Amino acid sequence: MQSLNVNGTLMTYSESGDPHAPTLFLLSGWCQDHRLFKNLAPLLARDFHVICPDWRGHDAKQTDSGDFDSQTLAQDLLAFIDAKGIRDFQMVSTSHGCWVNIDVCEQLGAARLPKTIVIDWLLQPHPGFWQQLAEGQHPTEYVAGRQSFFDEWAETTDNADVLNHLRNEMPWFHGEMWQRACREIEANYRTWGSPLDRMESLPQKPEICHIYSQPLSQDYRQLQLDFAAGHSWFHPRHIPGRTHFPSLENPVAVAQAIREFLQA
């Protein structure tokens, strides 16, 4: 792992592929890190210069830089990009890291970021989601709230990489980070209503591809198809899978979808 000090914090990152190839940032969600992309990054590194940054406080030492919000993560990423001297790049984000992706798209504009990719972003929160987030913010009950997410995500799979991510990698993060994550995730949904509303609010809209596997319901697929019919910049792409983690479960299909969208 390499590291940079930017915006008053330490950011660690992995880097692979030809540095002269198009640069692609892989952005995880809260309480995740570069390990989320252990299956996907090598596939994409055949065609891209792949960088997987870890958010502040998500490095191997969980360096404490005080409290922060999701807007801080966007500023950190912009500072990281400047420090690396990267002008042209694309982003692929997962889960609630997608809020950061769209914040950066808004700040840089569609001329610089004509396309972006979001993976398995919860577009339509279910009623139990709010209770999970509330429990996840509680100083003593956060473990139960966190486990509720894990149980939901593990219910439909025996995929070893996904289960390892849920049992070892995500629980590794301290309780303070989980509480912060749930607070910020809830704040974004309360502010914007849904990710579709957030994307629609962009004054300059890039082409946005949503790669997803879950939920399996036809209604969820139809929601996206209906939205795409009225918004030509939105491109839903369903791939086979039974989990919230397609980059771990089905990396070949995810890599193919990314290539086809970015290279079109």
Curated annotation (Swiss-Prot):
Effect of mutating S95 to A/C: Reduced affinity for substrate, and strongly reduced enzyme activity
SUPFAM superfamilies, per database record: alpha/beta-Hydrolases
Pfam families: Abhydrolase_6
InterPro entries hit by this protein: AB_hydrolase_1, AB_hydrolase_fold, AB_hydrolase_sf
Class in the EC hierarchy, top level: oxidoreductase
Cofactor binding, note field: None. Contrary to most other dioxygenases, this enzyme does not require a cofactor for catalysis.
Active site: H244
Binding site for substrate: W30, C31, Q32, T94, S95, W153
Known EC number: 1.13.11.47
PANTHER family assigned to the protein according to its UniProt record, in alphabetical order: HYDROLASE, PUTATIVE (AFU_ORTHOLOGUE AFUA_2G14860)-RELATED, MONOACYLGLYCEROL LIPASE
Function noted in UniProt: Ring-cleaving dioxygenase involved in oxoquinoline degradation and utilization.
Protein name: 1H-3-hydroxy-4-oxoquinoline 2,4-dioxygenase
Source organism of the structure: Pseudomonas putida (Arthrobacter siderocapsulatus)
Source organism phylogeny: Bacteria, Pseudomonadati, Pseudomonadota, Gammaproteobacteria, Pseudomonadales
